[in-house]
Amino acid sequence: RIGDHALDIYEFSLKLEPYKDLKLDEIEGLSLFVVKMIENSIKAYVNKDYELAEKVIKDDDYVDEKYAEIIDKLSKNEYSIDGKCLPFAIYTTLVVKYLERIADHSVNISEWVVYISNGFYKDKKIF
């Protein structure tokens, strides 16, 4: 799934090429943050690192906040996007949504690390 979303992001980035002057720095920062979440969730799984898994789970709150913030700004046109640039807003929305979904997949990996560590999955004891 993460790979599918990454491919979708790549395809939308090609469609965003004509609008490169409208680049949003927030998306680059968000993407780097999400990549770090992926790395940390895999590292937590390999090393059975409960604390790192918990960090990834908490980091998702930041991604959710940034997602909502960017979508809100796009919907209110706070980026002063010309009406001719509607595709920019649409493709950017999709890119940000896929980044948020990738972060969610990192959380899923981390939730299973927590389960492996203590038998709890989403705060419920499972045997």
Short names for language-model regions:
Residues 1-127:
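Cytosolic, long alpha-helical scaffolding segments
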